[in-house]
């Protein structure tokens, strides 16, 4: 099996490099004009493969360094969505009175070229504030389009400009309630509450949330940038005593650090929690522009004219399965690896889910990370081999997005701002104690009794406005505190 996988990897790299070189020289003049400021190149210094997950026969992002000093990225999919997003983002920036940075792209149907964006520090306090204001605009667009993959590896802090470098999951699928969700009223209201949170700013991936487990086992991950190293709550294979005769593999938690999204003021790392209100200002300004300007909704609807990637299982989970299958005990044959990967199947699974799990296993056997797509006007989900799995979704992504847009309001905006504040608070140093979160309620009466009565009414109104009602039942979202100070 090792021999087969080595041959497979070697062939996929050769095929990809040939494809990249062919595209590079066929578009030489355009690339020189768009990415090189007109400077000519005659060849490459290096092509560095596998700068991301591999899909569909080993295809992945590649870093290309030209002999004129220019570095750019080759991506094995169209970048039309990136261009469309940039136009929308630029429009909102102009409407909210802030500048934006234009990223250079060259897009085709099945691949595209993108300029290299570097992580650079802010020069002054004003730039830091502008950075987080722009993050608020990005957060709103992620919320409006149901994005779920805006984690730290997909956002680069380029001075005062946050730049999103992966748009494959735009637009996402915004969950909607189904009549099949729960047999009892209690189960249905719980499902409604779950859906409300799933469609909120929390699930964009940009805000700090507990990942890879709940409670004390969870790890705080976000795109807001932190200097702290992340320690995985699960074990991964690690090479020990390399370059010696005692080289071996041990399984242990791994420390990792997402560096590209870290914001710095000169050499000082910035704590994003100190700029929560800047994020909220950007979010609210973009939200209010969208409610007032119909052109924004038209531009948003333009994302629903094709397919987008949908995440059915975390990439880290696939990576764990893949790494486990490389253990010497399972590398004896393809059948041995498949026997291990069959753990993906679940007892009593439907024939529908069996087909999806079969595809996941087949992809992992070929060292690919499984990928799925949804079409804006279909209820099907499509796998990376082109297979269609019908009626996976209760309604089409476009229909779901229309329902999402209809519920947008000032009340919803305030609710999302509450989620932002609660989430960002976790970036502050934790003392392990439960925290109180004061809610800003406008209004003040000099008469003490009238003031108390007025504030009570506002609190009651707030509680009622946050209620999730279904049939004859009502529910609310709330916080569950853990010993590590997170919630």
What are these regions (language model features)?
Residues 1-21, 25, 161-457:
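C-terminal catalytic region of ATP-dependent kinase domains
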Residues 119, 477-480:
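Short amphipathic alpha-helical segments and their helix-coil junctions
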Residues 153-155:
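Hydrophobic residue at the +6 position relative to the catalytic HRD Asp in the kinase catalytic loop
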Residues 455-475:
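Long, well-ordered core segments of solenoidal/helical folds
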């Amino acid at each position: 099996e090792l021999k087969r996988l080595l041959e497979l990897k070697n062939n996929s790299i050769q095929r990809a490099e040939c494809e990249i070189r062919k595209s590079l020289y066929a578009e030489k003049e355009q690339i020189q004009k768009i990415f090189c400021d007109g400077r000519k190149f005659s060849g490459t210094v290096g092509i560095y493969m596998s700068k991301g997950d591999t899909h569909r026969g080993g295809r992945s992002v590649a870093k290309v360094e030209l002999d004129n000093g220019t570095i750019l990225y080759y991506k094995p999919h169209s970048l039309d969505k990136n261009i469309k997003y940039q136009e929308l983002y630029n429009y909102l920036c102009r409407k909210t009175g802030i500048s934006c940075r234009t990223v250079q792209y060259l897009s085709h149907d099945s691949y595209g070229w993108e300029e290299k964006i570097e992580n650079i520090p802010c020069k002054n306090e004003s730039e830091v504030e502008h950075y987080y204001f722009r993050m608020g605009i990005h957060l709103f667009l992620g919320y409006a389009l149901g994005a779920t993959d805006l984690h730290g590896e997909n956002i680069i802090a380029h001075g005062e400009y946050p730049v999103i470098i992966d748009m494959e999951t735009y637009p996402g699928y915004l969950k909607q309630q189904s009549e099949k969700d729960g047999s009892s009223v209690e189960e249905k209201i719980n499902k409604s509450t779950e859906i409300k949170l799933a469609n909120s700013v929390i699930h964009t991936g940009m805000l700090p949330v507990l990942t890879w487990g709940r409670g004390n086992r969870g790890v705080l991950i976000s795109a807001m940038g932190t200097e702290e190293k992340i320690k995985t709550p699960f074990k991964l294979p690690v090479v020990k005593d390399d370059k010696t005769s005692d080289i071996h593999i041990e399984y242990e938690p791994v420390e990792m650090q997402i560096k590209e999204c870290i914001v710095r003021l000169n050499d000082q790392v910035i704590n994003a929690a100190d700029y929560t209100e800047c994020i909220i200002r950007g979010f609210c300004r973009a939200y209010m522009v969208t409610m007032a300007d119909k052109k924004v909704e038209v531009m948003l609807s333009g994302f629903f004219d094709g397919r987008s990637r949908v995440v059915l299982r975390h990439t880290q989970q696939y990576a764990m399965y893949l790494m486990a299958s490389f253990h010497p005990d399972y590398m004896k044959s393809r059948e041995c690896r498949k026997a291990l990967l069959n753990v993906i199947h679940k007892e009593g699974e439907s024939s529908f889910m069996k087909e999806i799990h079969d595809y996941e296993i087949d992809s992992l056997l070929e060292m690919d990370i499984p990928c799925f797509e949804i079409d804006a006007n279909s209820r099907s989900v499509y796998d990376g081999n082109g297979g269609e799995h019908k009626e996976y979704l209760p309604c089409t992504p476009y229909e779901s997005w229309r329902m999402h847009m209809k519920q947008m309001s000032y009340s919803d905006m305030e609710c999302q701002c509450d989620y932002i504040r609660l989430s960002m608070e976790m970036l502050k140093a934790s003392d392990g104690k439960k925290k109180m979160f004061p809610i800003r309620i406008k209004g003040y009466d000099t008469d003490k009794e009238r003031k108390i009565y007025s504030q009570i009414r506002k609190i009651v109104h707030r509680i009622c406005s946050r209620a999730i009602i279904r049939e004859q039942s009502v529910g609310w979202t709330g916080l569950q505190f853990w010993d590590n100070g997170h919630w």
